[in-house]
């Protein structure tokens, strides 16, 4: 997994300092990974902003409650299957993603069957991306 070929498109801002501290910690460990914040609005406007922010060469990965739920090792393996493709992980706002955007996604991913605030999902995703990199590299960070 190459963090420089990944980015996160997230609707809304992180409002809790401790969550931002955690995100920043993992971003430092994943050089090249970026997070683009999009203004929160109604779901249709958010979907338009997401589509406008997507690059033509990016693979859209939508984070959603009904997506595939994977343990960390299969998640790392799945990311490896994407090879050198550019990946855009999309985290919707409070109302989630539109049905059209979900259908457009090449992969629909769930971090858990539980629902979390979108800012916490951001922290969980960057940690899992770091863990995936550690798994692929054989780092002791992941001790399963």
Curated annotation (Swiss-Prot):
Homodimer. It is found in: Cytoplasm. This is Ribosomal RNA large subunit methyltransferase H. GO terms for cellular component: cytoplasm. It comes from Synechococcus sp. (strain CC9605). The gene is rlmH. CDD domains: RlmH-like. Its EC number is 2.1.1.177. GO terms for molecular function: rRNA (pseudouridine-N3-)-methyltransferase activity. It catalyses: pseudouridine(1915) in 23S rRNA + S-adenosyl-L-methionine = N(3)-methylpseudouridine(1915) in 23S rRNA + S-adenosyl-L-homocysteine + H(+). PANTHER family: METHYLTRANSFERASE (PTHR33603), RIBOSOMAL RNA LARGE SUBUNIT METHYLTRANSFERASE H (PTHR33603:SF1). S-adenosyl-L-methionine binds at residues 63, 92, 111-116. It is an enzyme of class 2 (transferase). HAMAP family: 23SrRNA_methyltr_H. Keywords: Cytoplasm, Methyltransferase, rRNA processing, S-adenosyl-L-methionine, Transferase. It comes from the Bacteria.
């Amino acid at each position: 997994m190459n963090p420089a070929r990944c980015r996160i498109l997230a609707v809304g801002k992180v409002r809790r300092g401790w969550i931002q501290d955690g995100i920043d910690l993992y971003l430092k460990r994943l050089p090249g990974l970026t997070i683009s914040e999009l203004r929160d609005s109604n779901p249709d406007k958010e979907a338009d902003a997401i589509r406008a922010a997507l690059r033509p060469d990016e693979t859209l990965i939508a984070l959603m409650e009904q997506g595939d739920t994977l343990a960390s090792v299969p998640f790392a393996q799945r990311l490896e299957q994407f090879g050198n493709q550019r990946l855009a992980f999309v985290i919707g706002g409070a109302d989630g993603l539109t049905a059209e955007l979900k259908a457009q996604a090449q992969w629909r991913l769930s971090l858990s069957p539980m629902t979390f605030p979108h800012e916490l999902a951001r922290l969980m995703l960057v940690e899992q991306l770091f863990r995936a990199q550690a798994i692929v590299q054989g780092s002791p960070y992941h001790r399963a």
